[in-house]
Regions:
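Hydrophobic face of amphipathic alpha-helices that form TPR/SEL1-like repeat modules
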Residues: 21-28, 32, 55-57
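Short helix-capping/linker turns of helical repeat alpha-solenoids
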Residues: 12-15, 28-30, 35, 48-52
Length: 57
């Protein structure tokens, strides 16, 4: 399991799976303050790269 810090780093580098995971973390408030706006932004970044799960979040 990756730490939130690692997920943030990889997501910022453009990895769609990490972006989706970060969206999940923000949506559910896992290890970070719940923020639906940021969740949407991270899901959108992943979805724009073709990440299928993110396209439905």
């Amino acid at each position: 399991m990756n730490t939130l810090k690692e997920i943030i780093s990889v997501a910022n580098s453009g990895n769609a799976e990490a972006q989706n995971q970060l969206g999940d973390a923000y949506f559910d408030g896992i290890e970070i303050e719940q923020d639906y706006t940021l969740a949407f932004e991270w899901y959108l970044r992943a979805a724009q790269q073709g990440h299928k799960e993110a396209q439905y979040n």
